[in-house]
């Protein structure tokens, strides 16, 4: 069972004590939990069942933190991290735990959170939606850091709890074609005369090819652009430059926009560098299919999709004839969603830009809502759920990337006359403590 604690502000005391502790469980962020002097001790990198030597680094009234020094007795679920950058990079924090144990822990965390904070039983716990444990990310944003002394630009990810950039040669969770680009890309960027103007680098694997987006703070020279085009042609990628106003310049590819599709591209979603997409293509397909199955929208029903983005759920929900209303807080994604619907030949889908923290029941375009789907950011949809009683959808699917927000919002939903019928883990981010989930609520009676 996962444990959850809310730390209250208190003055920290730095300690140097070295202790031998027995780890009993993991917390919801993947840290090992032990006990000492009546306090909970959090130990990053430690696993349940292990005996470890640690050094206390922080102590507060009810808990302490410790640095892992040595594993005296290892868990049978401990594995060697695949990534050579694991001990420095802040991207993956559970590579040392067997993948089956990772998923079991996440599922337990999800159910425990909902049971505890929503004060309800989780209903039917569905099978975990999962796919490959490695090389699953179709998109990643790499950081850059320019060393003024050496004139070298580093390309990599941020270190854990730090702004430092860990220079990498590969990434074990990034799609293999994208991971393979990193060494040559880093070398090429260091050849640019304008490398000091480079910001982050976004790598994307779309259904129509691989894309490299370079954020630049000022224009690059024609010579630098020629080097980038040479790199693009050699590696068969499309390279774009993105300025501070998020405007993109294609250096090759004739303005081609990345896309991904469903159902053999009968439904196709184009997206831009600034648009949000789910990074795990295979799990996203399974998640969308499950959402459509759970809601089973009929041709005479109206479905409301809040936080709809570019139409990831809206378009598949409309495929069998239901009328779908997608609402999004970012105007650019609303415009892209409308284009995607038109290109997919779906004329019963409409998209609107709105403040999702406001009461949408008064919007003239809303009307009757038979069923509903929400897919909010980590902050959840607490404000949006306040008007649920006015809309009264028969069924609601909540897609969550933060189990704490889901648990909090579930309490609001239940108080408005709904019951939790199904819940399930969506393992969108293997090798990390992050978890996606889905819950189905149905109106009572």
Curated annotation (Swiss-Prot):
Catalytic reaction annotation: uridine(1939) in 23S rRNA + S-adenosyl-L-methionine = 5-methyluridine(1939) in 23S rRNA + S-adenosyl-L-homocysteine + H(+)
Biological process annotations from GO: rRNA base methylation
Residues that hold S-adenosyl-L-methionine according to the record: 278, 307, 312, 328, 355, 375
Keyword vocabulary terms for this entry: 4Fe-4S, Iron, Iron-sulfur, Metal-binding, Methyltransferase, rRNA processing, S-adenosyl-L-methionine, Transferase
Molecular function via GO: 4 iron, 4 sulfur cluster binding; iron ion binding; RNA binding; rRNA (uridine-C5-)-methyltransferase activity
Class of this enzyme: transferase
InterPro entries in alphabetical order: 23S_rRNA_MeTrfase_RlmD, MeTrfase_TrmA_AS, MeTrfase_TrmA_CS, NA-bd_OB-fold, SAM-dependent_MTases_sf, TRAM_dom, U5_MeTrfase_fam
Record domain TRAM: where: 12-70
Residues engaged in binding [4Fe-4S] cluster: 83, 89, 92, 171
Keyword Glycoprotein: no
EC numbers for this chain: 2.1.1.190
Active site location: 401
HAMAP family the record matches: 23SrRNA_methyltr_RlmD (MF_01010)
Function: Catalyzes the formation of 5-methyl-uridine at position 1939 (m5U1939) in 23S rRNA.
Family: Belongs to the class I-like SAM-binding methyltransferase superfamily. RNA M5U methyltransferase family. RlmD subfamily.
Name of the featured protein: 23S rRNA (uracil(1939)-C(5))-methyltransferase RlmD
Source organism of this protein record: Shewanella halifaxensis (strain HAW-EB4)
């Amino acid at each position: 069972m996962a444990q959850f604690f809310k730390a209250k502000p208190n003055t920290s005391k730095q300690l140097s004590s070295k202790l031998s502790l027995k780890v009993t469980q993991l917390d919801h962020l993947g840290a090992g939990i032990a006990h000492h002097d009546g306090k909970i001790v959090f130990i990053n990198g430690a696993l349940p069942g292990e005996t470890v030597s640690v050094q206390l680094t922080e102590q507060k009234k009810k808990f302490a933190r410790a640095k892992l020094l040595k594993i005296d007795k290892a868990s049978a679920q401990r594995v060697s991290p695949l990534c050579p950058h694991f001990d420095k990079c802040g991207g993956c924090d559970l590579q040392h735990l067997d993948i089956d144990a990772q998923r079991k822990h996440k599922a337990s965390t999800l159910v425990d959170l909902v049971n505890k904070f929503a004060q309800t039983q989780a209903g039917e716990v569905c099978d975990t939606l999962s796919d490959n444990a490695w090389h699953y990310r179709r998109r990643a944003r790499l950081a850059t850091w320019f060393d003024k002394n050496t004139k070298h630009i580093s390309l990599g990810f941020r270190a854990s709890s730090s702004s430092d950039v860990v220079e990498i040669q590969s990434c074990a969770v990034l799609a293999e074609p994208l991971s393979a680009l990193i060494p040559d890309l880093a070398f090429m960027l260091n050849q640019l005369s304008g490398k000091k103007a480079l910001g982050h680098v976004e790598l994307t694997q779309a259904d129509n090819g691989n894309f490299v987006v370079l954020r630049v703070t000022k224009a690059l020279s024609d010579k630098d652009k020629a080097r980038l085009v040479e790199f693009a042609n050699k590696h068969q990628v499309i390279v774009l430059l993105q300025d501070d106003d998020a405007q993109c310049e294609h250096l090759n590819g004739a303005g081609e926009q990345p896309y991904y599709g469903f159902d053999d591209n009968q439904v196709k979603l184009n997206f831009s560098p600034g648009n949000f997409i789910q990074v795990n293509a295979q799990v996203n397909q399974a998640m969308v299919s499950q959402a459509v199955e759970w809601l089973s929208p009929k041709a005479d029903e109206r479905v409301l999709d809040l936080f709809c983005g570019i139409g990831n759920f809206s378009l598949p929900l409309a495929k069998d004839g239901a009328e779908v209303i997608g609402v999004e807080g970012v105007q650019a994604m609303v415009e892209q969603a409308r284009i995607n619907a038109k290109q997919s030949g779906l004329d019963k889908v409409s998209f609107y830009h709105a403040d999702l923290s406001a009461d949408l029941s008064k919007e003239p375009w809303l009307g009757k809502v038979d069923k509903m789907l929400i897919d909010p950011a980590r902050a959840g949809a607490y404000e949006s759920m306040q008007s649920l009683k006015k809309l009264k959808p028969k069924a609601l699917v909540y897609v969550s990337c933060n189990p704490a927000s889901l648990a909090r919002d579930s309490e609001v939903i239940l108080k408005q006359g709904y019951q939790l019928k199904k819940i399930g883990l969506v393992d969108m981010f293997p090798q990390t403590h992050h978890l996606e989930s889905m819950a189905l609520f149905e109106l009572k009676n």
